[in-house]
Amino acid sequence: MTLHIPDKTLLERWLDEASVEYGLCSQCEGLHIPALQEVEGVVDSRLFVESYGLLLSTELEIRPMALLHVSADLGRLNMDFPTLKIFIDLVDDATPQLVLAGCLPVNAGITREQFAHFFAVTVEATAQVAAECLHLDYLFAAADS
């Protein structure tokens, strides 16, 4: 079993080997994940290599009228989805966002299988949170756009 400390190139290879579609942009260093970006309510989803490990971050656009409800529900969401860090991002002139982040420390090295497991678990949990938030009317639905 070979352990790797992944960089962006290795992640691209592992995603290719797993037939996971991803995209690059000139605005950030992340690998954009279309499978999550296509989920209703999702603004963006990216996989980053950070100094502490891998970060799979997804932003959901919160309806401003639901902000208080989402804020009150954060504790439950974080308990129900322990593999994610879930928090609200408020910026002065932008719509509030619910950020869902999965983190995998990799400085001791990981295998391709460990990465695949982290990726699959994080994508599934993220999709479940997005579906629940849509059901609770926390997010802008496609019909609202």
Could you say what each language-model-derived stretch is?
Residues 134-145:
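Short, highly charged C-terminal tails/helix-capping segments
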Residues 55-97, 101:
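Short, internal acidic amphipathic alpha-helical interface segments
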Residues 36-65:
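Long, continuous compositionally biased terminal/linker segments
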